[in-house]
Amino acid sequence: MHFPALAVAGCLLSRATAQSLDQVLAKRDSFSLLRDLLHQHGLVDELEFTANATFFAMTNQALRSLADFGINLTTADPNIARAIFKYAQLDAIYTTDTVKALHHEAKVVQTALQPHLFNNLTRGQAAKLRSNRTGGANGILVESGLGVLTPVVEADIPYDHGVIHAIDANMVLPHNISETARLGGMTEFLNLLERSDSVARLESLSDVTIFIPQDEALAKLQPILDMLTSEQLKSVVAQHAVPNRVLYQSLFDGVETLETLDGSTLRIRRGKRGEIFVNGAEVVRTDLLLYGGVAHLIDGALLPEKDASCSTGLFAAAAGGSSRVWKILASHQLTLLAVLAMALVSILYKAYQSRKQSHQLIRPSDGLGNYEKV
């Protein structure tokens, strides 16, 4: 019967002894550089009075490592410093128990980084939280731009309006699509963006979802892509971008039709095991955070479906395209047939030569079991 009273007393004691964000940072030597920087850039009050927040506090080690990398927040552009610190604050409280309840599923969360400070999203920039699968002491990983994972080294430090988690490395601001592709090893898609002169167009968009084909998928279409002009390639790129929609994987539910940048449509559906399909391609990596939205990595290029009964393969992918792309490919049909015919002749000739050689490779030269090549 005394437990409720004890709980109330504990709650009151907690509130009576709660401290401000600045007071908590001041009591820990590992946050001395962070506290100085927050005062220098006038962020203490702004971060302090955001209710129900989670703040990923960079330790002295994190700030020194960032300076060694070339970004000294004491002397850097104040806007860069403000962006990094505001990106480290989430708009809700996420404790260790909250994150562990995700069961290794990543959760997209909103940060305090609002447009147009190093991001181009109407609702502000996002980060991702997941449970630490390595069984770390604190069990929290925060994912930021470029897919960088940062582990929490000390968790659940309370302050007046939320909770602090200490990190020994900085969170990375999400980059634009070209830098994300370049640094993420998405070489073929980056080449396609540059060849089609689509970089500026995509990077000017706010609230965009981009589906990035894996290198292997684009390599299969390379013979066709090589025959297209820059304008035609631009149309292909546009079919991989959905404007005015920031579609994190948690928002995909059931079947939905999306309109792409060039006005064609994509069909999104959830599989029985929770997998996500875009037309015939499967999403193999979700929620790559971008400066202007989000990207998903897929295992096939998106030439929107024209006939669901088409078989798989290069020409099926082409036939699945929009009428504009199909007309482009049809205009080159004689060239394609010639290339395929030459390839077939070459394969048959090599097979004939190989068979002939295998029949005449050796013959007996004496009666002692010795052989010689023909």
Swiss-Prot record:
Read off the SUPFAM superfamilies from this record.
FAS1 domain
Question: Which pathway does the UniProt entry assign to this protein?
Answer: Mycotoxin biosynthesis
| Residues carrying covalently attached carbohydrate according to the record | 52, 72, 120, 132, 176
Instruction: Note the InterPro entries from the entry.
Output: Adhesion/Biosynth-related, FAS1_dom_sf, FAS1_domain
Report which superkingdom the organism of origin falls in: Eukaryota
Q: Give the subcellular location.
A: Membrane
Which SMART domains does the record cross-reference, listed alphabetically? FAS1 (SM00554)
Recorded GO cellular component terms are: fungal-type vacuole membrane
Q: Where are the transmembrane segments?
A: 328-348
Listed under GO biological process in this entry are:
macroautophagy
Residue ranges occupied by any FAS1 domain in the UniProt entry: 19-171, 173-302
* Keywords assigned: Glycoprotein, Membrane, Repeat, Signal, Transmembrane, Transmembrane helix
Q: Which residues form a coiled coil?
A: none
Q: What happens when the gene is disrupted?
A: Abolishes the production of cercosporin.
Q: How does it sit in the membrane?
A: Single-pass membrane protein
Q: Where in the sequence is the signal peptide annotated? A: 1-18
The UniProt entry, under Pfam families, shows: Fasciclin
Which Gene3D superfamilies does this chain map to? FAS1 domain
* Signal found in the keyword field: yes
Q: What is the role of the protein in this entry?
A: Fasciclin-like arabinogalactan protein; part of the gene cluster that mediates the biosynthesis of cercosporin, a light-activated, non-host-selective toxin. The perylenequinone chromophore of cercosporin absorbs light energy to attain an electronically-activated triplet state and produces active oxygen species such as the hydroxyl radical, superoxide, hydrogen peroxide or singlet oxygen upon reaction with oxygen molecules. These reactive oxygen species cause damage to various cellular components including lipids, proteins and nucleic acids.
Q: What is the similarity comment for this entry?
A: Belongs to the fasciclin-like AGP family.
Official protein name in the record: Fasciclin-like arabinogalactan protein CTB11
Where does this protein come from, organism-wise?
Cercospora beticola (Sugarbeet leaf spot fungus)
